[in-house]
């Protein structure tokens, strides 16, 4: 349960160690973290999959440190390991290239041939590249990493939407798909940000919305608006909208009560909300037999009424009036479509070209990962839309009803 109390993966600075086999990456990662998180051996190819450890590095803050397999791994399994290693680049902020000694196992020339290609790929992705020579001081490397000036971090979930003292209502359905004894991560993060911003936050289920509205005395309501913002789980949009008051006098923002969802807040923070809105137009153009890719940034146990595999497909078929085919990916899996990188580090994935991508809010993804997925879709000419927007439309709301 400790993971529930840690800074989410998507909000950490990602640092990964790259190089050839037996360059000393795992030894360095163990020394860097102060723990034996990676297996160390003289046998080439000991590290088979990326291994990560969450830690704090001041003044950077919460980080995720990842050890990777050697980029020169060989054979069928070796190629799969290299592919896994390169997947790490999709989320990394700082890449450390580990130079091995010219000891016969990893000649410097081979590493030297590959490093310029690797560094160029990192620069293209906006990743900071540092170098470490085997045997150098580990504390010195930590200081180098701590001194890195990363581009501005992603904005807060509620930036520009509320001010200190505002009242926020969070509507959290508890159904068969809800985890026992806790809230899901997006709800946790939004509620925490409400507290950080000095907001007065009320949390209830959809059925308790009328009671929550009565908690705010009329004298405390500017222009008859009980809450400055209502945030709901996307699947409850229709029910919550019907329970909110429609006073004759509109609020100061020009709306009755501002309504949005947890998913849309994350799309606004980590992705490109306008690109998602554009993607909605593609729903009307879907035809019978078209393939829709449903993508989630995390992996979790699927329940009988799972939002990604059950509710989103139902919503899309309702909106389009068509019988559709669905493919599902989760976690770090995301197709490169027909995009081919010419850096020499990657090869194109098997051709896959859906008619539409529907993506979750991305609470477990970094902003870099989310924007890369949007860019891949855009480059391949595949419209992409967010869970929250699809569910809002399926519940009879208009885009302008939920965009804030």
Annotate each PLM feature:
Residues 1-79, 83, 87-94, 99:
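Conserved G1/Walker A P-loop phosphate-binding module
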Residues 41-43, 131-136, 262-263, 388-390:
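Beta-strand->loop->alpha-helix junctions that form or flank phosphate-binding loops
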Residues 2-4, 25, 49-52, 80-85, ...:
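A generic local structural motif
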Residues 162-404:
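P-loop NTP-binding site
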């Amino acid at each position: 349960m400790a993971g529930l109390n840690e800074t989410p993966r998507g909000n950490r600075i990602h640092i990964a160690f790259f190089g050839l086999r037996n360059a000393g990456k795992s030894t360095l990662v163990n020394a860097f973290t102060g723990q034996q998180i990676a297996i160390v051996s003289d046998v080439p190819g000991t590290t088979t999959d990326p291994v990560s450890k969450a830690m704090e590095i001041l003044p950077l803050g919460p980080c995720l440190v990842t050890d990777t397999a050697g980029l020169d791994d060989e054979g069928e399994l070796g190629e799969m390991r290299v592919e896994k290693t390169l997947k790490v680049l999709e989320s990394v902020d700082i890449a450390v290239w580990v130079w091995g000694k010219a000891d016969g196992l990893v000649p410097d020339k081979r590493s030297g041939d590959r490093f310029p290609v690797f560094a160029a790929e990192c620069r293209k992705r906006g990743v900071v590249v540092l170098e470490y020579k085997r045997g150098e001081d580990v504390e010195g490397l930590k200081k180098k990493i701590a001194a890195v000036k990363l581009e501005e971090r992603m904005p807060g979930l509620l930036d520009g939407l509320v001010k200190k003292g505002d009242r926020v209502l969070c509507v959290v359905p508890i159904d068969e798909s809800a985890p026992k004894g806790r809230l899901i991560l997006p709800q946790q993060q939004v509620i925490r940000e409400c507290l950080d911003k000095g907001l007065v936050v009320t949390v209830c289920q959809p059925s308790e919305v009328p009671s929550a509205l009565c908690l705010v005395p009329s004298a405390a309501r500017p222009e008859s608006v009980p809450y400055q913002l209502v945030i709901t789980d996307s699947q409850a949009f229709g029910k919550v909208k019907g329970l909110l008051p429609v006073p004759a006098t509109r609020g100061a923002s020009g709306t009755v009560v501002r309504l949005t969802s947890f998913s849309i807040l994350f799309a606004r923070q980590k992705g490109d909300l306008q690109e998602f809105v554009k993607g909605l137009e593609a729903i009307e153009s879907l035809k019978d037999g078209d393939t829709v890719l449903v993508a989630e940034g995390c992996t979790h146990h699927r329940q009988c009424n799972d939002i990604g595999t059950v509710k989103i497909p139902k919503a899309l078929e309702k909106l389009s009036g068509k019988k559709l085919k669905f493919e599902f990916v989760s976690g770090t899996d995301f197709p490169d479509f027909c995009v081919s990188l010419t850096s020499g580090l990657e090869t194109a994935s098997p051709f896959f070209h859906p008619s539409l991508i529907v993506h979750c809010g991305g609470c477990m993804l970094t902003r870099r990962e989310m924007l890369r997925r949007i860019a891949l879709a855009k480059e391949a000419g595949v419209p992409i839309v967010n869970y929250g927007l699809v569910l809002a439309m399926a519940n009879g709301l208009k885009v302008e009803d939920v965009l804030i």
